[in-house]
């Protein structure tokens, strides 16, 4: 039985991506500036992982009246109390930020007493977590180091596999994706916690993977069509990998959409940020990391070097 590969686009497509190079650069610069301004104005909504505080997970015997609960707990005078559903409508997450260890137990008991005195529900407390401010700072440092090491490892890999200018193209695309993702986080007020660090690392990996696929095809076509100029080769390479790129992004977005719809509040920030990052990474691999190679076109590509490179 013969198996036919799934194709979303015709085998031969000749869309002139390079013709939109200046437009895409301008668009990306504008988006990056908006993201930087948003970060400066709105900051980040740091979660308890980073700023410290209390998390209480509780299951109720019926659907709670969240607006009334927020009002009652907000009147306790212990700071901003955040209530969210996760999993089901009867599962509740209660978060109180910036609590010190000195009044930790007092605040927990105060919240429990207020719930029992004001609501006729049966409460099943499933988890009570506390993260101190010192631990939060350590987690921020660890998350930052994880991102820096991932950048470094990616640059070394690209430099070994391709050439330094390919690595520079991917670095610029990654910085673009990172700035847009951080700006999106600040504008949408997504929780900035350990799961969002994982989301950023996922976005970096996805963006690099997309760019490497196109770069690999560019290197192959440089060997095959050494008489063509670099602009024609980049256009050809993007078009040849376009069906694969679109199919990959659709299947990945659908899988991630399931996490957004059914994963619950606990992984909402992760899922939404990855969804946005996949779109940004796909865009940057086509319209930034590949076209930016034309900046080095005047420094003639040494095709013999590519022929010998494995």
Curated annotation (Swiss-Prot):
One GO term describing the cellular component: plasma membrane
SUPFAM superfamilies found in the cross-reference section: Multidrug efflux transporter AcrB transmembrane domain
Keyword field: Cell inner membrane, Cell membrane, Membrane, Protein transport, Translocation, Transmembrane, Transmembrane helix, Transport
Compartments it resides in: Cell inner membrane
Recorded topology in the membrane: Multi-pass membrane protein
Membrane-crossing residue ranges in chain numbering: 20-42, 140-160, 164-184, 194-214, 246-266, 272-292
GO molecular function: protein-transporting ATPase activity
GO BP annotations listed: intracellular protein transmembrane transport; protein targeting; protein transport by the Sec complex
InterPro entries named among the record's database cross-references: SecD/SecF_arch_bac, SecD/SecF_bac, SecD/SecF_CS, SecD_SecF_C, SecD_SecF_C_bact, SecF_bac
Pfam families from the UniProt entry: Sec_GG, SecD_SecF_C
Disulfide bonds: none
Entry's family note: Belongs to the SecD/SecF family. SecF subfamily.
Quaternary state and interactors: Forms a complex with SecD. Part of the essential Sec protein translocation apparatus which comprises SecA, SecYEG and auxiliary proteins SecDF-YajC and YidC.
Role according to the record: Part of the Sec protein translocase complex. Interacts with the SecYEG preprotein conducting channel. SecDF uses the proton motive force (PMF) to complete protein translocation after the ATP-dependent function of SecA.
Protein name per Swiss-Prot or TrEMBL: Protein translocase subunit SecF
Organism, scientific name: Rickettsia canadensis (strain McKiel)
Phylogenetic lineage: Bacteria, Pseudomonadati, Pseudomonadota, Alphaproteobacteria, Rickettsiales
């Amino acid at each position: 039985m013969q198996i036919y590969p799934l194709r979303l686009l015709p085998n031969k497509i000749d869309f002139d991506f390079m013709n939109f190079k200046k437009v895409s650069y301008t668009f990306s610069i504008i988006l990056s500036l908006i993201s930087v301004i948003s970060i400066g104005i709105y900051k980040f909504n740091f979660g308890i992982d980073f700023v410290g505080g209390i998390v209480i997970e509780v299951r109720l015997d019926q659907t709670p009246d969240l607006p009334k609960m927020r009002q009652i707990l907000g009147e306790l005078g212990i700071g901003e109390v955040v209530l969210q559903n996760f999993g089901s409508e009867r599962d509740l997450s209660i978060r109180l930020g910036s609590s010190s260890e000195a009044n930790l137990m007092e605040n927990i008991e105060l919240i429990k007493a207020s719930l029992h005195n004001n609501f006729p529900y049966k409460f099943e407390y499933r988890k009570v977590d506390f993260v101190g401010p010192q631990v939060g700072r350590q987690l921020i440092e660890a998350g930052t180091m994880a991102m820096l090491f991932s950048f470094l490892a990616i640059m070394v890999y690209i430099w070994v596999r391709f050439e330094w200018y390919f690595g520079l193209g991917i670095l610029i695309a990654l910085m673009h994706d990172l700035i847009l993702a951080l700006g999106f986080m600040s504008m949408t007020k997504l929780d900035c916690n350990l799961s969002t660090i994982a989301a950023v690392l996922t976005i970096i990996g996805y963006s690099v993977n997309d760019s490497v696929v196109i770069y690999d095809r560019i290197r192959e076509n440089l060997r095959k069509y050494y008489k063509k100029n670099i602009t024609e080769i980049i256009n050809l390479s993007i078009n040849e990998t376009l069906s694969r790129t679109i199919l990959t992004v659709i299947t990945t977005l659908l899988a991630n959409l399931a996490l957004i719809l059914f994963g619950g509040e606990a992984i909402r920030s992760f899922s939404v940020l990855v969804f946005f990052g996949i779109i940004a990474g796909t865009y940057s691999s086509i319209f930034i990391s590949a076209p930016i190679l034309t900046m080095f076109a005047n420094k003639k590509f040494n095709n013999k070097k590519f022929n010998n490179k494995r």
